Amino acid sequence: MQKIRKGDKVVVLTGKDKGRTGEVIQVMPKEDRAVVRGVNVVKRHQRQTQNQEAGIISKEAPIHLSNIAIADPKDGKPTRVGFKIDGEKKVRVAKRSGEVIDG
């Protein structure tokens, strides 16, 4: 079970976007990276195609998983993730507050 999943609210811990929060759009476990909405935005030069014109577009680049942390559901501050068996299910738990992380 992954600690960070698509749809999670995360906080950036280091880098140019330190302190910003966003939603995980995509997780790449083999590269240990994730794409977060509104974070690590870069400019890309787009070549003209049949259905898209040329120009410079902004898009989110992947960020390393070590540089982001799950936002605590209680107060939104960064927290580590633990696991707990809840009945028959294994659930993710915020170490900071003990709250179950939805997912």
Curated annotation (Swiss-Prot):
UniProt keyword list: Ribonucleoprotein, Ribosomal protein, RNA-binding, rRNA-binding
Pfam families, alphabetized: KOW, ribosomal_L24
GO biological process entries: translation
GO molecular function: rRNA binding; structural constituent of ribosome
Database matches in CDD domains: KOW_RPL26
Gene Ontology cellular component list: ribonucleoprotein complex; ribosome
HAMAP family given in the database record: Ribosomal_uL24_B
NCBIfam families registered for this protein in UniProt: rplX_bact (TIGR01079)
UniProt subunit comment: Part of the 50S ribosomal subunit.
Record-stated family: Belongs to the universal ribosomal protein uL24 family.
Function (record text): One of two assembly initiator proteins, it binds directly to the 5'-end of the 23S rRNA, where it nucleates assembly of the 50S subunit.
Protein name, entry field: Large ribosomal subunit protein uL24
